[in-house]
């Protein structure tokens, strides 16, 4: 499930593609009920909120359902394993790149306008993906979905603040968590039903086509209901920084996805090194731009803040593993064990249900480093039990064994990541908060793309090198799970660099 991205004026919200961050918007007003003296909110504002929530849910659904249709997609487009990796990575990587500038564009040209443009573009991307005759067109459609989704999503948070002033905002922001949970649980089931019933004979294409009608209705309703702004703001935009960051990440992800099938020629390694070098150039460019008094995509002072750096590392490591395991598990169940898409979706929602329960538990336990550690230990245990179960039973492993283990893993993920955003964001200054929020949400998407690329390549390499395809997929998932357990343990080690709880002063090196 993806997290709702953040503009400079928006608060942090739970991600939508990959594991959720399980947090409510950190800068939303108090959750207390509106006072009786507060003016009532008009019905049109609540209807506008529905439009915004539909956009958020569609993003969450789109990030989740494609893994269920993976085997059918490969058979239809005659693609190799890299196609599945690109189907996921193209979306998350393009969204991560777009999120760095999406919020600022809304401030410059108007949130309502950019929301509607983004929704129309997301619809066209869904339609292009559904109609794709070849793999390249499908990837282009996914890139379009990611970029335009990144343009659309940050605007919703800002518009809610104008639709629900004062104490009313808490109630509106409070609906985000439950709606994302619905997307997390309902997305895989919807995908499984569509694939099993296949009412229009579209097979995997129905997973993208299902977006079109809700998107069109949301655009029509949005034109009538979303608030009009008096004027846009005159701001500068760092196009150079945006291009550098996007190019760097593409240069890193491309060889990770394609390198195995190409035999790792020298140019793939050179591209990987070049992408890492470009990230360094991007950071230097951001520092120079900030020193010149111009707006930067990421405030350079954040990289002297221990809380922010530790949080960035934790999100990169934690989401890199957990974001990929969901997709690989779905592929193992279908391509390895021969489960139907519907049964696969039922098994995989156990993790989403666990996350939902974990979020609720995290709220009770409090936003502390200790809560994060407890959750991560449970997540590692769940992943380890899954690994041991598959290793012990091999091709005879069944849904009854995997479901409780995935529930445990999801519970740990929900508890562990619940306090993350609040601890990190309250560890930076007010001037850095907007930049930090956008950077963290982008990193969550980037880490998922990197995880899908690296663990996906390992998964398919092991599967291809094993005589029995069924055992090959089992061994591939075992290896990915083992690495993810190590990554979770590394995340636990990084917790020592975070404050004990939210709202402690930021600490700089």
Identify the function of each model-found stretch:
Residues 89-103, 149-157, 161, 349-361:
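Central cavity-lining transmembrane alpha-helices of secondary-active solute carriers
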Residues 1-61, 75:
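Cytosolic juxtamembrane N-terminal segment immediately preceding the first transmembrane helix
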């Amino acid at each position: 499930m993806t997290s709702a991205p953040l503009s400079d004026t928006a608060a942090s919200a739970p991600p939508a593609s990959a594991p959720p961050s399980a947090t409510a918007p950190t800068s939303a007003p108090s959750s207390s009920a509106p006072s009786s003296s507060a003016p009532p909110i008009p019905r049109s504002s609540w209807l506008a909120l529905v439009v915004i929530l539909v956009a958020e849910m569609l993003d969450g659904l789109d990030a989740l359902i494609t893994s269920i249709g993976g085997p059918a997609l490969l058979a239809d487009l005659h693609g190799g394993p890299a196609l599945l990796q690109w189907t996921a990575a193209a979306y998350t990587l393009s969204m991560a790149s777009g999120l760095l500038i999406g919020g600022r564009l809304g401030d410059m040209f108007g949130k309502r306008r950019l929301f509607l443009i983004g929704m129309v573009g997301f619809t066209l991307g869904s339609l292009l993906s559904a109609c794709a005759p070849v793999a390249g067109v499908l990837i282009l459609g996914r890139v379009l979905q990611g970029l335009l989704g990144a343009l659309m999503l940050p605007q919703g948070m800002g518009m809610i603040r104008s639709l629900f002033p004062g104490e009313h905002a808490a109630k509106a922001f409070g609906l985000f968590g439950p709606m994302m949970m619905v997307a997390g649980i309902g997305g895989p089931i919807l995908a499984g039903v569509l694939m099993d019933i296949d009412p229009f004979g579209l097979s995997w294409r129905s997973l993208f086509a299902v977006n079109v009608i809700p998107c069109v209705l949301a655009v029509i309703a949005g034109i009538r209901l979303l608030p009009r702004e008096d004027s846009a703001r005159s701001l500068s935009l760092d196009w150079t920084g945006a291009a550098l960051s996007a190019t760097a990440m593409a240069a890193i992800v491309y060889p990770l996805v394609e390198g195995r099938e190409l035999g790792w020629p020298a140019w793939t390694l050179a591209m990987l090194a070049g992408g890492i070098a470009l990230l360094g150039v991007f950071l230097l460019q951001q520092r120079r731009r900030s020193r010149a008094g111009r707006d930067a995509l990421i405030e350079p002072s954040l990289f002297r803040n221990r809380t922010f750096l530790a949080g960035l590392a934790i999100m990169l490591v934690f989401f890199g593993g957990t974001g990929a395991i969901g997709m690989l598990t779905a592929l193992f169940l279908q391509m390895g064990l021969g489960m139907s898409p519907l049964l696969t979706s039922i098994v995989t929602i156990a993790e989403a249900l666990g996350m939902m329960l974990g979020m609720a538990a995290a709220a009770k336990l409090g936003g502390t480093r200790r809560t994060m550690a407890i959750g991560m230990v449970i997540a590692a245990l769940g992943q380890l039990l899954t690994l041991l179960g598959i290793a012990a039973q091999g091709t005879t492993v069944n849904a009854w064994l995997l479901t409780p283990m995935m529930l445990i893993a999801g519970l740990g993920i929900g508890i562990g990541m619940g306090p993350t955003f609040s601890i990190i964001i309250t560890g930076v200054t007010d001037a850095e908060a907007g930049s930090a929020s956008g950077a963290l949400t982008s990193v969550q998407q980037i880490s998922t793309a990197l995880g899908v690329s690296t663990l996906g390549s390992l998964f398919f390499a092991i599967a291809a090198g094993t005589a029995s395809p069924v055992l090959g997929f089992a061994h591939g998932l075992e290896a990915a799970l083992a690495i993810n357990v190590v990554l979770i343990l590394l995340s636990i080690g990084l917790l020592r660099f975070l404050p004990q709880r939210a709202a402690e002063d930021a600490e700089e090196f």
